[in-house]
Amino acid sequence: MVRRKRQEEDEKIEIERVKEESLKLAKQAEEKRRLEESKEQGKRIQVDDDQLAKTTSKDKGQINHSKDVVEEDVNPPPSIDGKSEIGDGTSVNPRCLCCFHCHRPFVMHEILKKGKFHIDCYKEYYRNRNCYVCQQKIPVNAEGIRKFSEHPFWKEKYCPIHDEDGTAKCCSCERLEPRGTNYVMLGDFRWLCIECMGSAVMDTNEVQPLHFEIREFFEGLFLKVDKEFALLLVEKQALNKAEEEEKIDYHRAAVTRGLCMSEEQIVPSIIKGPRMGPDNQLITDIVTESQRVSGFEVTGILIIYGLPRLLTGYILAHEMMHAWLRLNGYKNLKLELEEGLCQALGLRWLESQTFASTDAAAAAAVASSSSFSSSTAPPAAITSKKSDDWSIFEKKLVEFCMNQIKEDDSPVYGLGFKQVYEMMVSNNYNIKDTLKDIVSASNATPDSTV
């Protein structure tokens, strides 16, 4: 008890000493600032006097001899970039008087734990030492180093073992399941977090309003898709089978979530998807119906079911761009450039969602200032849900989806998007002009003039 009391007293003394030295450094910095202001003011006065003397001499027809102004620092302030001595003669770098977490000085904040942290920063710092999944302290290894994994977007730190111990991961937002929460397993063994489940599109009927919205969005960019074709939500197995029959193999490096088909196929479409029951239990009674999709350049679009509306819409916009290219005779484009353009359209739709509004004037203003345009394109379709009505998670989810596109470094989708984006920048974000560059770079010629 006595030892603990003595330790607390020592900490208080240390805190007071750090505060005193921090205030001293702040005072020195303020004196330096004032001295520099005084010097600048002196320069301005000297310049004004010289100009006045020149003007007077000129008026009198005399030759004015300028004088060199020699300035010297009187008692120059000590530098706060190097080390300073504190009361007991110890040499301390001012950076040591900053918070270990936010790196701001302690002058305007309370401090804790021997001057290392602001109180709020201390809580944040030590909160991040706990695993996001198991809520336990992230362990140190044999070398005494605390190693952790962290999602690049969500910034949630967790024990590396959870990547391998069967912890559920949401197939939409990629977050691991924290202990004490219940992720939902879909019929094709994918996991979905409760937040993503809240706006998930579960069957073919549910996706049709989004289908019409995406078509209006393309028409607003002068990329109207005239042909009618099927849009079906399917399970993962049906999507993989259709991909094989389309003889597409470049998706294998990534998870396939959508497909624009050109071959006649019989596809099991989900006409009644799963529903949430009592106590957040998923009722997985899925009803499917075999549908024949046939036609010419485009026979239909398949999208995996159970993803949130924002992610489903982005995938649909991507596949709709594939459909537009095929229907308008753009063949034999370089794979990475075609996929990059489709990613760009998916990004454009996501961006339009962040500005969704029921105010037509506001929507028009957004469209006119948008980074993607098609000469004098009218405003894109106005969505049924204003972004102001979104939950905090939905606002983060749309940022996550856009970040996934921009930060992707895969050879086809990621690098393709970056190449196309550079073309768009050089064409002032005009899609049609960018498409001409893509055709030229692919040594391809469209079958029709668009």
From Swiss-Prot:
* This protein's UniProt keywords: Coiled coil
Q: Say if the entry is tagged with keyword Coiled coil.
A: yes
> What start-end ranges are recorded for coiled-coil regions in this protein?
1-46
Residue ranges of region Disordered?
Answer: 27-87
Q: Does the keyword ATP-binding apply?
A: no
**Which cysteines share a disulfide bond?**
none
Which Pfam family would be a valid example here?
DA1-like
> Which spans does this entry mark as compositional bias, Basic and acidic residues?
27-47, 56-69
The protein's name in its UniProt record: Protein DA1-related 3
